[in-house]
Design a protein with these regions (language model features):
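N-terminal topogenic membrane-targeting module
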Residues: 61-140
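Solenoid-like repeat scaffolds
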Residues: 61-66, 96-105, 134-144, 172-182, ...
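TPR repeat positional signature
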Residues: 74, 112, 151, 188-191, ...
Length: 275
């Protein structure tokens, strides 16, 4: 199994090598063009040599671009593999992507991000957090496009290991950003879990109607968990009727007995007869 530290070391090494390779290729390209423009004695021979070198370089760039595009297309399948539990297949492909050479960084960065997703799905929270931070450390356009999903993964991983300060920092960087609907739903779930852990119950029920509406758009398990947090917050604030209404909505979505295992705090609420 590929460890987070090994993957990051490999990624950083390959990024350094690709930078050096791009510089060397640029020097060769300039040399080839200069040779092709030679007009002194023997210039036509240098022109042929320069033209041949230029053709080889263009072929190399084309091949690298094709391989990068192919790797990026393969990477598009990894989230589906992870979501359906095909962890070994996803890991093999990610490992191959991180091992292959490319002068471009995009496929490597996608591999690192998807490895973070895989470790998160496997509940290996510490490794997921390390990988997310490695992605966020990259100051390139591709990394910026992965910043929001990486921060959401980072926040959840840190919540699971009890690092509330780190989770808050990750979440706070998302508040001022424009999020997709899926990202907004994930952020709401993380906000509620964080607020529950720190006892910020009034903040949890603030804007309740909008939160319930957003929960209705979520997958069943996420909708149940979101409304369960809202129900618990209302209960802690003494709003029994609201807590009961939200708790009943949770019961309509999931099996209460199984859900008590996932969220033991609901046992107290349901056993009291508030719901």
């Amino acid at each position: 199994m590929l460890s987070a530290q090994v993957a990051i070391v490999r990624f950083r090494r390959d990024v350094l090598i690709s930078r050096v390779a791009r510089v060397l290729l640029f020097v060769l390209l300039v040399t080839a063009v200069a040779a092709g423009m030679g007009d002194s004695e023997g210039g036509w021979e240098r022109g042929i040599a320069g033209g041949g070198m230029l053709a080889l370089l263009m072929g190399f760039f084309f091949l690298q671009g094709y391989r990068d595009l192919k790797s990026s297309r393969q990477a598009a399948d990894w989230p589906a593999m992870i979501a359906t539990g095909r962890f070994e297949q996803a890991e093999r492909q990610i490992d191959l992507s991180l091992r292959s050479f490319s002068i471009y960084r995009r496929a490597k960065l996608l591999g690192l991000h998807n490895l973070a997703m895989l470790r998160h799905a496997q509940q290996r929270w510490d490794e997921a957090a390390i990988l997310c931070r490695a992605v966020l450390d990259q100051q390139v356009a591709m990394a910026r496009s992965l910043a929001k999903p990486s921060r959401l993964l980072l926040a959840d991983s840190l919540l699971q290991v009890g690092d509330l300060a780190g989770a808050y920092e990750a979440l706070s960087r998302l508040y001022s950003q424009r999020l997709s609907l899926a990202e907004a739903m994930t952020l709401l779930q993380l906000q509620l879990e964080y607020s529950w852990r720190v006892g910020a119950y009034p903040a949890m029920v603030s804007g309740l109607a909008a939160k319930v509406q957003l929960a209705e758009l979520m997958p069943t398990s996420s909708a149940a968990r979101t409304q369960a947090f809202l129900s618990l917050a209302a209960h802690r604030l003494g709003q029994k009727e609201l807590a009961g209404w939200l708790g009943q909505r949770v019961k309509l979505l999931v099996d209460p007995e199984r859900f008590k295992v996932e969220m033991p705090a609901m046992v107290e609420l349901w056993n009291e007869g508030s719901v």
